[in-house]
Amino acid sequence: YYFRFDEHRHTLVCSDRLYVQERIAGGPVLFSAQPEGDNPQPVLHSFRYSENVRTARQTQRDYSFKRPTYDQEHHLAGEALEHQGSSYERYDYPGRYKQSGAGRPFSESRLRGHRRDARVASVSGDDPRLIPGHAFALEGHPRADFNAWWRPVRVVHRGTQYAGQEEESADAPLGVSYDLRAELVPEDVEWRPAPLPRPRIDGPQIATVVGPAGEEIHCDEWGRVKVQFPWDREGRHDEFSTCWIRVAQNWAGADWGHMAIPRIGQEVIVDYLDGDCDQPIVTGRTYRATNRPPYALPDHKILSTIKSKEYKGSRANELRIDDTTAQISAALMSDHGASALRLGYLTHPRPEGGKPRGEGFELRTDEHGAVRAARGLLLSTEEQLRAGAGHLDRGVVVQVLEAALELARELGDYAGEHQGVGHDA
């Protein structure tokens, strides 16, 4: 940046490009190694040039969940690599871009920032025409290759106005003095400052899921949600509080996995990939005073459950597991029609025991029911302890039928002996 001074106003000019800047007016800047104050016109009296071995190649990668198989890798080589290590590579991940089209400009800017002082000159003098970004031609240096075009990237002006005689003692310095210090790069170098470190988030944060008024679930095609952070003073707990934020699920496969979208009002835990404040992700959910667990605790601490809530309603679906000692059970239930499949020790959840309803299984509903099996259906009261055979095994049933057949034969024979009707088989 630099200041432009006019008669009626002063302007602060900021730019992210050097090559679009002007050249200074008034001809070349002169160099003279004479001591300060011994030159009749403004000059640069000190010129120190240095070269530093810096990054010669920049490689960057990044990741986007929208294109997970594409590495978004970009390679750029520096310019003017004389006296440099051409194999000196810097590899950065993440590259701070999510679209490949932005990758090259990011990589280019990063490389230039790392090479900002690969070729640099430090000067001092009293020519006030030096302005950051404005090129000038240097003349008068004993090394001909230094008499070239340069651009200042940093200028420090220092001026002093000493007090008058009436204010200080007779031996106090009088008049004014001015000098400057500047850093220069060759005019053809598109200079960039050092890359700034990315602000890092120290650990996860708590937030509340938000969305439009009247909604209970608000997400996009990726299952992302929006949240309101407790520290946010500007948000209004609506769909504009944050950007879309990804949600971690227990399973996530190709058309398979677990899916449970955080609902508006739920408290969630938000973490940040690589500590990057621009890459939040919901990693968990927590209960709180306004969102209590499905069953009172610690009374029902032996229960494990997955219980949903009817969208814009009050009913629920639930998969419940009861691990009560010697009375374990599982149940799959829906409030619609009071439909349920209960397995094991049949009873309702209870903190201090309850009246048993039976043992085994119960499939029931207040609505209609149907059992269909295209390839056969076996209903039997014969035991098959611990599922020791195939689920359609009919060995025991055949034995019963054979015993019944034998009994029928015996009864037939007995009837024939006593003048009854003979049997058919």
Predicted regions and their residues:
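Amphipathic alpha-helical and helix-coil boundary elements used as assembly
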Residues: 1-425
